[in-house]
Regions:
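Conserved N-terminal entry element of GNAT/NAT acetyltransferase domains
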Residues: 1-21, 188-191
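Conserved GNAT-fold acetyl-CoA-binding loop/helix
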Residues: 28-55
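A short helix-loop-beta-strand connector motif used in the catalytic cores of GNAT acetyltransferases and
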Residues: 51-69, 117
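Conserved beta-strand in the GNAT
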Residues: 69, 94-104, 117, 122
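Conserved acetyl-CoA binding element of GNAT-fold acetyltransferases
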Residues: 112-125, 177-180
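Conserved acetyl-CoA-binding loop-helix of GNAT-fold acetyltransferases
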Residues: 120-123, 129-142, 169
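Conserved active-site alpha-helix within GNAT-family acetyltransferase domains
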Residues: 134, 146, 158-176, 187
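Conserved GNAT acetyl-CoA-binding A-motif
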Residues: 144-156
């Protein structure tokens, strides 16, 4: 029986240094998606884009941070055919198809002081609506719960309705709206 897209298997694991090129690729894809939906979205600087691998490497170094990735295959390995009639070969390393960054932040001016923040959540288009973001988010929630973090926050763009729908299905509720304007636009408005 042919495998359907919905039945594809994946596993979630903590990102490693070997994943850095794919983390960079996925973050740039996220930026491209958001800019494609609304060119007013803030862009990553060229310097940050060039240094994304180092940026993610520094995030991975800290114990209060995690980057989780989704890997094709039940155990993170997707069999590759060797040829007609031969057994498949397990690759030594499978490339991620999704990512999610979660950090524990401390701010003594807020209550709760310690909270979680999710950033840079991405699933490659062919893996969407397959439960991958649910798996990544559950991994982040487990990480936070083990560290007794009681609240987690994230941002999603208004111009990306699928993202808002996804996050709300995962239990996030919109509590605040951020507004953006140029000073010139503000000054040019009539009362």
């Amino acid at each position: 029986m042919a495998e359907t897209k919905r039945s594809r298997k994946y596993s979630i694991r903590r990102a490693t240094e070997r994943d850095l090129p794919e983390l960079k690729r996925m973050r740039i894809a996220l930026q491209d998606l958001l800019i494609g939906r609304d060119p007013r979205v803030w862009r990553l600087s060229p310097e940050l884009i060039d240094g994304l691998e180092e940026f993610y490497s520094k995030i991975m170094e800290k114990d209060q941070n995690r980057i989780f990735v989704a890997i094709p295959g039940k155990n993170g390995d997707s069999p590759l055919p060797r040829g007609r009639g031969s057994n498949p070969v397990q690759p030594p390393f499978s490339q991620p198809v999704a990512m999610l960054v979660v950090r524990i932040l401390d701010n003594s001016n807020l209550d709760p002081v310690r909270f979680g923040r999710i950033d840079d959540a991405w699933v490659d288009p062919e893996w969407r609506e397959r439960g991958v973001m649910t798996g990544l988010t559950r991994a982040a929630a487990s990480f936070l719960a083990e560290r007794r973090v009681s609240m987690v926050m994230l941002d999603w763009a208004n111009n990306n309705p699928p993202s808002g729908t996804c996050w709300q299905k995962l239990g996030f509720e919109p509590l605040m709206t951020m507004g953006f304007a140029s000073p010139t636009d503000i000054l040019s408005r009539k009362e």
